[in-house]
């Protein structure tokens, strides 16, 4: 039996969000889900009882929009830190990659992607996510593979279990799991995972991950051209300047996203582009965003779906987290306008993160950016362009995830989770340019280091691969996706 509760799942089962019967079903589902999690916690040795199960604390703040989110640890807390505390009581932090278990205990703090990822993946097969986030092969960088080869090998997670626990957990991820609970350690890649590895190798051999200098130059020139035009118009045509700079900031955000995901000397050299153009810390963003890629739509781990108290993407009775009915009932009306503050909040987190880390390089780049922003531009144009850019990014960046399946546990392998949590947008021309690669979100999530200008050509290849293996490749028009997001917020506003 697997417990995986989400508003979408309840809707699919024919449960309407109103009425006492629906409320009873939601409450029962919430109690069942929390009971499963608490039962699992009792099977893990800990120095003292943990009192921070889901529902006892406010939980993770919104990494995406909340002004209260901390700038460190990718802005993610995990179920009141219960899961993290469970992992830390173990003797080793171990991941399985390509069939081998590696002891990552000593490496966790030095991991460029942050220690939180290794802590949460402890005891799991990380093969697909490792290769997704670290390029390799003829068009990539083998740094991560070389570092991996230097790590000590070890046995599986059963080494750290007591005799009683071993009886409960010995089959997890293979053929059995604790009664009534989802798999905690999913460590057996199936046929689809092997086929996905073959697909990635095919793309590598055929050069899909290589950067095209002409296309790179065209995208960069277009983005900088919008900045130049806005700067030129700032003194005489402030509204046009604000729109031009806002568009430029949106496109610069997409471009910085490409550079940080990408590998090779060009992307490494352009890593600070987001700091210079938008005031974004590459280090802060990378940690936050890699958590999203690794744990897409997994409640308590993916900060991009944890937006309370500003937005409720799930029924509070299901999550067990505090409700705010006064705000929630209006969220479908203020939701989209509030996205305008996305960039302002990302900027705040970026400065706080760079300052806390005493990162002199990033602080210098941020200083150059803010000197230009507030000395070369009128104040109204500077602030207005941040709001325009923030709205254009915020309204699109998570639209393809928020109404898809939200999972309470990491049930399934990396590829399976991406198909369940992601929808693509069917757009062309100017509309595709505005989406900046977010329209091919599933392609991007499966192959994050692939340049976005190759996504549309890769889409039919992946669609065929998915159809042959029974995966649901979801794609809708942008109007349908944005409407679906509005209706989802409205449905949760009226529960």
Predicted features by range, described:
Residues 210-252, 275-280, 330-345, 356-397:
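Alpha-helical bilayer-embedded segments of polytopic membrane proteins, i.e.
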Residues 393-410:
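Transmembrane alpha-helix/helix-exit interface in multi-pass inner-membrane proteins
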Residues 179-191, 235-238, 248, 258:
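Long, hydrophobic alpha-helical transmembrane bundles and adjoining juxtamembrane helices/loops
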Residues 191-209, 341, 345-349:
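Cytosolic juxtamembrane N-terminal segments of multi-pass membrane proteins
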Residues 2, 34-202:
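B-type heme-binding environments
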Residues 3, 244-357, 408-494:
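Membrane-embedded catalytic scaffold of the fatty acid hydroxylase/desaturase
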Residues 1-25, 29:
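N-terminal chloroplast transit peptides
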Residues 202-211, 318-324:
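Cytosolic juxtamembrane amphipathic/interface segments immediately preceding
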